[in-house]
Amino acid sequence: MPVKKKRKSGVAAAAAEDGGLKKCKISSYCRSQPPARLISGEEHFSSKKCLAWFYEYAGPDEVVGPEGMEKFCEDIGVEPENIIMLVLAWKLEAESMGFFTKEEWLKGMTSLQCDCTEKLQNKFDFLRSQLNDISSFKNIYRYAFDFARDKDQRSLDIDTAKSMLALLLGRTWPLFSVFYQYLEQSKYRVMNKDQWYNVLEFSRTVHADLSNYDEDGAWPVLLDEFVEWHKVRQAS
């Protein structure tokens, strides 16, 4: 989860600066770290301990903001852009990228039964496993739209959309790099929720060679234009 300053996606900023997918450094791996300390079954979850853990990162407004989030990521050994942070935010039902409120933290960490760094590190495999479950991944993908958008906007700006799509689909969708290139040169400056939802459906149902693409289907114009653009490129 990118650390968001002035409500701007850090991943999106990186993509805009680097100018393309090849240089958009989005990680699904943890930085090198010592193994998490084994937690014995006798160490039960403590709400008091969880709250004290929250205050290690929260500011005077009782919110973990950009600076606290950077320290939190450093302590747990995960880059802010790591997809684990997106899954964690989903589990905490966090509303805004780069911020955890006290209520979100306590509710989410209670659900995960985590009241310290080591317990959360021991949950990393579980958090990753949510990405392999079709239903959970769909929920995470849909959650990412509202999580990443500026709250005064109904759509995602296209740079943020490209970065979040790279995070979520970049390693699994064979056509992703082509779709990314299409978005790079397209007229689109935002992506709305319907388009966002349909990109996932398209990636799951349409073959990489587009052989089963239905021109009369109810796809958004954005995807119709992508298919047309891709076919023209292939023909030339």
From Swiss-Prot:
Keyword Lipid biosynthesis listed: no
Residues of the DCUN1 domain: 45-231
PROSITE patterns the UniProt entry points to: DCUN1
GO cellular component, one term: ubiquitin ligase complex
Single GO molecular function: ubiquitin-like protein binding
Post-translational modification: Phosphorylation at Ser-40 is independent of cullin's interaction. Phosphorylated in response to both TICAM1 and MYD88 dependent Toll-like receptor (TLR) pathway activation. Phosphorylated in response to IL1B stimulation.
Listed GO biological process terms: DNA damage response; positive regulation of protein neddylation; protein neddylation; regulation of cell growth; regulation of protein neddylation
Keywords noted in UniProt: Cytoplasm, Cytoskeleton, Nucleus, Phosphoprotein
Residue numbers carrying Phosphoserine: 9, 40, 47
Pfam families: Cullin_binding
Protein's cellular compartments: Nucleus; Cytoplasm, Cytoskeleton, Spindle
PANTHER family from the UniProt entry: DCN1-LIKE PROTEIN 5 (PTHR12281:SF6), RP42 RELATED (PTHR12281)
Oligomer and partners: Part of a complex that contains DCUN1D5, CUL1 and RBX1; this interaction is bridged by CUL1. Interacts (via the DCUN1 domain) with the unneddylated cullins: interacts with CUL1, CUL2, CUL3, CUL4A, CUL4B and CUL5; these interactions promote the cullin neddylation and the identity of the cullin dictates the affinity of the interaction. Interacts (via DCUN1 domain) with UBE2M (N-terminally acetylated form) and probably with UBE2F (N-terminally acetylated form).
Its biological purpose: Contributes to the neddylation of all cullins by transferring NEDD8 from N-terminally acetylated NEDD8-conjugating E2s enzyme to different cullin C-terminal domain-RBX complexes which is necessary for the activation of cullin-RING E3 ubiquitin ligases (CRLs). May play a role in DNA damage response and may participate in cell proliferation and anchorage-independent cell growth.
Domain remark in the UniProt entry: The DCUN1 domain, also known as PONY domain, mediates the interaction with different cullins. The DCUN1 domain mediates the interaction with the N-terminally acetylated NEDD8-conjugating E2s enzyme leading to the NEDD8 transfer from N-terminally acetylated NEDD8-conjugating E2s enzyme to different cullin C-terminal domain-RBX complexes; the neddylation efficiency correlates with the DCUN1D5-cullin and DCUN1D5-E2 interaction affinities.
Designated name of the protein: DCN1-like protein 5
Lineage: Eukaryota, Metazoa, Chordata, Craniata, Vertebrata
Gene: DCUN1D5
